[in-house]
Design a protein with these regions (language model features):
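Hydrophobic recognition helices of helix-based DNA-binding modules
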Residues: 91, 113-117
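Thiotemplate assembly-line natural product biosynthesis machinery
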Residues: 4-61, 119-124
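Short, cationic-aromatic polyanion-contact patches
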Residues: 104-114
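Phosphopantetheinylated carrier protein domains
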Residues: 80-103, 123
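Glycine-rich loop motifs involved in handling phospho/adenylate chemistry
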Residues: 32, 60-76, 96-105
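Short alpha-helical elements of helix-turn-helix
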Residues: 42, 78-81
Length: 124
């Protein structure tokens, strides 16, 4: 990749992730450069955080992988769609709507997207 295209990718990511918490943008740039799936969790958590209210952000920050997206974080289907679209753009993956229905917890989301980022079949 040329220097100009690297700058363009970084500018695009910076715009996409502008309201995400610190570290999200940097993880996305690193992921795009080397496709290392270890960055996926930081990216996904940052994108989810961006779409939450302040009290929900605290719940997310102090929880484990069993935290439920809808029940515990109060996410609705529109918010989930916004999260999915931003994750797809950032990670350059496609998320199947049928598989999306099975993602209930933060752990489900992280495992699914980490597998997608590695080019593996996601867990069912």
């Amino acid at each position: 990749m040329s220097s100009d295209s690297n700058i363009s990718v970084e500018e695009d990511l910076k715009d996409l992730l502008k309201r995400c918490p610190p570290g999200t943008f940097e993880a996305a740039v690193a992921f795009r450069k080397n496709k290392d799936a270890s960055y996926v969790e930081k990216i996904v958590m940052g994108i989810i955080d961006r779409h939450l209210e302040p009290d929900q952000r605290e719940i997310l920050a102090n929880s484990d992988d069993m935290l439920r997206m809808y029940e515990d974080l109060g996410m609705d289907s529109l918010t989930m769609l916004e999260v999915v679209m931003l994750v797809e753009q950032t990670l350059q993956v496609s998320i199947d709507n049928e598989e999306l229905r099975d993602l209930r917890t933060i752990g489900d989301v992280k495992a699914y997207l980490s597998a997608k980022a590695r080019g593996e079949k996601p867990p069912t």
